[in-house]
């Protein structure tokens, strides 16, 4: 076995059972990985020097093909309603077949870290079949100092073999694609998909399982820090403005997707960003755009023209086009990946029903209720001629990555909010003046002004009213913001239509929350919107 690159010789990939490998490349940097990628015909270069790869049939994650090993250790700690079980026997068989499939191949190894907090990190070794996957994960996770590599010992291992095709009958899986997570032994096997995001989310899944047992809250969120050291956390599902609103030139970006909250404050799990690029422009998002114009960035499923110029408006391969780059490609990014205890938590929603106010203040119990609900609304595709919005509830703002029961994360969040006296806000970046198709999108200028007032503390001094449907506190007047949009009902021409729409959304919240009723106390139950409606 030919081995190249700095690594701990006492912890080679042979310790994972990988033998009879043609060649192993450890911890190669970007330039070497570019050479290997092009030599192997895996990707091409853009005119500006980014590496451009296509992922084939899988242009997004495959949540239905993800399995968690069910054993004595995980039996009582994993939320099996949301995680598909795999038997220990099936996993061992799959693992043996992965080892067999890797024989004779060239493999790429990156020894990386998940978690910027030394007390709460995990050494994650990622072994990949493709050179471009090695660069992708090197960009996304935290890279140890060069001198630390010779003594690096992995605590978690991901083996990523896109050319492996799973036999559904043999392993009890659904398709040829498989993501098998062994939380007890900290091994992840990824096969039958070239979508690189699966590797990143596997580390997130592991930390989401490990950290709550240590009293540390894992979060699917972005985070930034103000000039006075005040940290803000932004929860939100895809399309709610999480990346856009946390990328503020006046504040330091801690990270854009995955963080932990522990005794020392907020810390990033990652060392890079994985940003959507569909319809990306230099005018709207200059910092993200700039990363796509340089060497070292990986562009995923972005279409190039004959001159190798990226066309970010072309969604012919997928709408889920992405770029992966190290955090230090962003000028105002944190070098430490850490921030203090948060002063504000923002829960973002894009309410396409046009019912919710642009901002509301939440009590700790309401924050837990809305965190467990994880609400946003998607707008149906116009090609189907459907104008009715579709409510989406993804608990903890990231259900696919949460191995434990949501109430564990919810209780931990509520405890930390109370302990550190954090102000919590619900911010609606969706529709005002009517539902989607009638109303208009909430003006981004208004959202930014409300957010700025929340973050600098001035919004706490405003006069508030209690929303009759949701029971949270809504400011009556905020300097620089049109007062009319603060009361969503007043923006609707047809008040009866608003009331009917509000009741419809409230009912959706209530129905969705039924599965959590037995896991929460009376305070959180009382934070439900239906209580207010019933009382009137």
From Swiss-Prot:
GO terms for cellular component: cytosol. The keyword Repeat does not apply. Pathway: Carbohydrate biosynthesis; gluconeogenesis. It comes from the Bacteria. Its main location: cytoplasm. Its cofactor is Mn(2+). ATP binds at residues 201, 220, 236-244, 285, 322, 447. It is found in: Cytoplasm. The lineage of its organism: Bacteria, Pseudomonadati, Pseudomonadota, Alphaproteobacteria, Hyphomicrobiales. Substrate binds at residues 61, 195, 201, 322. It is an enzyme of class 4 (lyase). Belongs to the phosphoenolpyruvate carboxykinase (ATP) family. It comes from Brucella anthropi (strain ATCC 49188 / DSM 6882 / CCUG 24695 / JCM 21032 / LMG 3331 / NBRC 15819 / NCTC 12168 / Alc 37) (Ochrobactrum anthropi). This is Phosphoenolpyruvate carboxykinase (ATP).
């Amino acid at each position: 076995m030919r081995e190249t690159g700095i690594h701990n010789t006492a912890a080679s990939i042979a310790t994972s059972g990988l033998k009879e490998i043609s060649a192993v490349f450890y911890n190669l940097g970007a330039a070497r990985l570019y050479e290997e990628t092009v030599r192997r015909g895996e990707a091409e270069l853009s005119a500006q020097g980014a590496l451009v790869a296509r992922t084939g049939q899988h242009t997004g994650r495959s949540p239905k093909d993800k399995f968690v090993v069910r054993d004595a250790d995980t039996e009582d700690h994993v939320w099996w309603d949301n995680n598909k079980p795999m038997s220990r026997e099936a996993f061992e068989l799959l693992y043996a077949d992965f080892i067999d499939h890797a024989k004779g191949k060239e493999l790429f190894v990156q020894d990386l870290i998940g978690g910027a907090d030394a007390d709460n990190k995990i050494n994650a070794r990622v072994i990949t079949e493709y050179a471009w996957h090695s660069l992708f994960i090197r960009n996304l996770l935290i890279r140890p100092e060069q001198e630390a590599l010779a003594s690096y010992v992995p605590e978690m291992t991901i083996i990523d073999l896109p050319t492996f095709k799973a036999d559904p009958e043999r392993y009890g899986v659904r398709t040829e694609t498989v993501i098998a997570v062994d939380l007890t032994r900290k091994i992840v096997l990824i096969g039958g998909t070239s979508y690189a995001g699966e590797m990143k989310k596997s580390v997130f899944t592991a930390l989401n399982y490990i950290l709550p047992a240590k009293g540390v809250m894992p979060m699917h969120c972005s985070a930034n820090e103000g000039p006075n050291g005040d940290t803000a956390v932004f929860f939100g599902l895809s399309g709610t403005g999480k990346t856009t609103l946390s990328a503020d030139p006046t504040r330091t970006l801690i990270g854009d997707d995955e963080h932990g909250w522990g005794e020392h404050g907020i810390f990033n799990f990652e060392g890079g960003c994985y940003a959507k690029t569909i319809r990306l422009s230099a005018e709207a998002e200059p910092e993200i755009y700039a990363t796509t114009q340089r060497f070292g960035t990986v562009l995923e499923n972005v279409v190039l023209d004959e001159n190798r110029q990226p066309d970010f408006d072309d969604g012919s391969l997928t709408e889920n086009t992405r770029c992966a780059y190290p955090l230090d490609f962003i000028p105002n990014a944190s070098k430490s990946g850490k921030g203090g205890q948060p002063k504000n938590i923002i829960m973002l929603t894009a309410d396409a029903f046009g019912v919710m106010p642009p901002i509301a203040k939440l009590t700790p119990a309401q924050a837990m209720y809305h965190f467990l609900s994880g609400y946003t609304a998607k707008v149906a595709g116009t090609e189907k001629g459907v104008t009715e919005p579709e409510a989406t509830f993804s608990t903890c703002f990231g259900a696919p990555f949460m191995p434990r029961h949501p109430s564990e994360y919810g209780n931990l969040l509520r405890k930390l909010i109370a302990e550190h006296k954090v102000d919590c806000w619900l911010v609606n970046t969706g529709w005002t003046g009517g539902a989607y198709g009638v109303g208009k999108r909430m003006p981004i200028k208004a959202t930014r002004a409300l957010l700025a007032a929340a973050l600098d503390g001035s919004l706490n001094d405003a006069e508030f009213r209690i929303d009759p449907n949701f029971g949270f506190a809504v400011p009556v007047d905020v300097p620089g913001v049109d007062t009319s949009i603060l009361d969503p009902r007043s923006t609707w021409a047809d008040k009866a239509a608003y009331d009917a729409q509000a009741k419809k959304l409230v009912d959706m919240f209530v129905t969705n929350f039924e599965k959590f009723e037995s896991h929460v106390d009376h305070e959180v139950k009382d934070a439900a919107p239906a209580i207010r409606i019933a009382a009137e």
